[in-house]
Amino acid sequence: MRDYDEVTAFLGEWGPFQRLIFFLLSASIIPNGFNGMSIVFLAGTPEHRCLVPHTVNLSSAWRNHSIPLETKDGRQVPQSCRRYRLATIANFSALGLEPGRDVDLEQLEQENCLDGWEYNKDVFLSTIVTEWDLVCKDDWKAPLTTSLFFVGVLMGSFISGQLSDRFGRKNVLFLTMGMQTGFSFLQLFSVNFEMFTVLFVLVGMGQISNYVAAFVLGTEILSKSIRIIFATLGVCIFYAFGFMVLPLFAYFIRDWRMLLLALTVPGVLCGALWWFIPESPRWLISQGRVKEAEVIIRKAAKFNGIVAPSTIFDPSELQDLNSKKPQSHHIYDLVRTRNIRIITIMSIILWLTISVGYFGLSLDTPNLHGDIYVNCFLLAAVEVPAYVLAWLLLQHLPRRYSISAALFLGGSVLLFIQLVPSELFYLSTALVMVGKFGITSAYSMVYVYTAELYPTVVRNMGVGVSSTASRLGSILSPYFVYLGAYDRFLPYILMGSLTILTAILTLFFPESFGAPLPDTIDQMLRVKGIKQWQIQSQTRTQKDGGESPTVLKSTAF
C-alpha cells in the first residue's frame, strides 16, 4: 500500500503551493517570538530609590542625603530599599544641623520605603514593576510572573496535541492564535499584579498551542525534503524574527500598556491567514473525510499548474489504512528496559539544562551592560546563524558530537565572564552572545536527535516527556536570573557549569547519524557503557553456569 507521500508525489517538492504554506505557517509564528519575551520590557525594573515626600520639611542638603549609600560595581549609589528615618532627619533639618558635618550619617536610624518609590524614567516610562511597586520585599513577583507564563506553556503543551488530533490542525492553530492575542489584549486592563499574571498564564497556553499546531500542520502538508528545513529553519528563524522585532517596538513605545497594545496588532493581522492556510489532508483522511482532503490536494495541484490524476486515493488503500490499529503503549515503556530508562533520564537532563540556558540568557537582557534594546536585538539576531549552523551540522556531522560541542562552547564562555575585568563590559556582553549562540544551536538540534533515539512505538511519548522537561527548565530560568541581584556572576557560573556537565553527558548518548530509525524498543541504539556492562554481566552469568544473554552491538565511543 502506498503512503500519503507517495500518493501526493505528483504535486512536486517545492512548487508555489508548498512555498506559500511554508511562508505563511512560518509567518504565523512571528507573534510567538515577541509575546514570549515581552516580559523583558513589560516587567523591566528601572533604578529606584525611596520616595521622600515633598510635604516633609527638609533642607536641600538633608533631602540630598536622605538616602543611604551602598557600594555597587565599585561605585557609591543610593540604596534602593532603605532611607534614613524621616522624622529624625526632619528634626535635624529644623535645628539647622548639616549632614556629614554636624551629624554622622552612619549612626542614623534607617527605615523602609514607607511612602513608596521614585523610579528612573530614562529607560522605561512605565512597567508593571513601577505601576505596582514590585521591588524590594515584593521583587520576587516579577520573576514569578515569568515562571507562571511558562507554567501556562507547560499546560498548553499537554493539551495542544489532543485538541489538534480531535478538532483539526487548522482550527486549533487559529483558535490558539486568537487566544494568545485576545488575552494579551485583556492584559491592558489589568488592575493589579494578580490579574496580569493569570492572563499571562493563558497567553502562555495559547502561545505554545499555536506553535505546535503550526509545526504539525507544516510537517503534514509539506514534502519529506522540505519538512526538515521547515522544522529547523522555517519556524525557528521566524520565531527569532519576532524576537528581533520586540526591542524595536519597545524602543519607541516605553509605556507597558501601549507596548502590549502594539504587540497584539500582528496577531490580529494573522487572522487573515485563515483564508490561505488549508486543513491538513492527512488529518482529514484519518477522520474519514477523504473528499475534503481530495479537494485540498486538487486545489494545490491547480495552484502548482499540475493536472491531478482522476483518482487520487484508491478505495482499497483507504480501507487498509483505516483497518490498521496502532498498538497501545504507555509512559511506563520509557523506563521498561535499562537502556531506554537511561536514555530517558539523560534526555530529561539534556532538555532541562538547555532550556534553562536558553531562556535564562534571553531573560537576563536587563542585567547586561549597555543599551537594553540593542542587547535584546543582538540576543535575538544571534539565533538566526545558530539555527543555520544547527541545520548544517545535522546534515553532515554526528549528532552527539555536534550537540556536545555547541553546549561546551556555550557553557565555557559563560564561565569566562567572571574573569573579564569590569571595564571591559563589552567583552562580557559579547561572551553572553556567544553563549546564547551555542545553546541555541544545541536547542535546535536536540529536537531531531531525540526523535531519532526513540523507537516509532514511543517516539511521540519520548519527545513529549523531554519537551516537558524543557518547560520545567523554562519555569526555573527566571530564578537563575534573579540570583544576579545577589551576585551578578552567579547566574553565568550556574548556567555555564550545568551546560558543560551536560555537554560531557551528551557524549554518552548513542549516535543516530546515518542509522535507521528504530521501530521497537529492542532496536534502540545502546547508551555508551551499556555494552561493557552487559559483557561483564554475561561473564558473571557464564561463571555461574547460566545462559549468556544476547549482546546488541552498539556504536563505538
From Swiss-Prot:
CDD domains: MFS_SLC22A4_5_OCTN1_2 (cd17376). Expressed in the proximal and distal tubules and in the glomeruli in the kidney, in the myocardium, valves, and arterioles in the heart, in the labyrinthine layer of the placenta, and in the cortex, hippocampus, and cerebellum in the brain. Expressed in Sertoli cells in testis. ATP binds at residues 218-225. Residues 1-20, 164-172, 219-232, 279-341, 395-406, 452-462, 510-557 are cytoplasmic. It is a multi-pass membrane protein. Residues 42-142, 194-197, 254-257, 363-373, 428-430, 484-488 are extracellular. It is found in: Cell membrane; Apical cell membrane; Basal cell membrane. This is Organic cation/carnitine transporter 2. It comes from Rattus norvegicus (Rat). The gene is Slc22a5.
